[in-house]
Amino acid sequence: SQDFTVFGGSLSETFAEKICKVMDLALRNGAPLIGVNDSGGARIQEGVASLGGYADIFLRNTLASGVIPQISVVLGPCAGGAVYSPAITDFIFMVRGVSYMFVTGPNVVKTVTHEEVSFDQLGGADVHAGTSGVAHFVHDSEPACLAAVRDLLAYLPQNNLDGAPSRHVDGPPSDSPNRREERLLDLIPDSSNKPYDMHEVLRLVMDQGSLLESQ
């Protein structure tokens, strides 16, 4: 995690070593990796050493890809190197009015292009969920966001050697696994060129209340 109250959450050489150690432990033990991102990027006072720390983090992101689940929770304004790592993780959670992701902030954009843009227009949660496609989940509050992270973990295996988790669902009698859904016969059209609502198919096939939709 990154603490914005300490040097704006910027990455120093020592801070990068701490993050890399946690990532190594997650890989060694086959445990999901959850990052709480709230950082302004590299600590410019340390120069190249800080940038080298990002290289070490990115390397571990790629080594962990497909091995353990990697989840990024963006809970503040993140810029520069602080957004490259989340962008190559498996899932990104953002909060409206709180989370921002951009390579450079609005002030730099104004200086270079003379165009005025707000934080939300440049890298807000809705922009990344609806336009860039970077964010997978968007919520209106931090507690709701963190609760959703816990919900997602219930659907994921611990690592690539672990089986998919299963759980008992206390649904109504109408939600029996042996039920027949006659509506499926009419819902899916005969023509492969005719569209239909996939959400309705999923709701009929899956256990009630078990559908978790990702962007």
Which residues does each PLM region occupy?
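Terminal amphipathic helices with adjacent charged low-complexity linkers/tails
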Residues: 137-202
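Flexible beta-alpha connector loops of hexameric P-loop NTPases
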Residues: 5-14, 45-51
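Conserved catalytic cores of soluble enzyme domains
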Residues: 37-161
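Short charge-dense sequence patches
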Residues: 8, 95-105, 200-210
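A structural preference for short, pocket-lining loop segments at secondary-structure junctions
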Residues: 1-3, 18-44, 215
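Non-catalytic terminal/interface segments that mediate subunit docking, oligomerization
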Residues: 1, 23, 27, 193-215
